[in-house]
């Protein structure tokens, strides 16, 4: 029975993108530039996917849209079978339960390492937020840096903080 439960859970669609289009106003103020056009994607729980393409083709834009930082012009994005982005729906990033490690790490310079990791856990009580952040700080072997600020860390350490925050 346990194998069947695992099999059913792993086949569950975690992310579904249907005919996604994302556009930006053109720099000259006339018309729009299409960043993503007609993207379809289904990713099951436990499955690993990869976006490949040349520089500027829209990979980061798609990831930002999944996280909620970019709106869908047309099409829709579903997380766990719930529409989180479409022309008429936009669930804010903090309500999507999606983490992302940015190319530049995007750490808040005025927050300590522990505060950076806890930032996305605002819906938890303070003690649970701190405990969860400390758990992930331990997992990335930076528990001794909890009170440090991002500028006091190496690039590799900053990346591990960003990874802990995404988790």
Task: Give a label for each model feature.
Residues 1-7:
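Short, Lys/Arg-enriched N-terminal segments with co-localized hydrophobic residues
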Residues 10-167:
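ABC family nucleotide-binding domain
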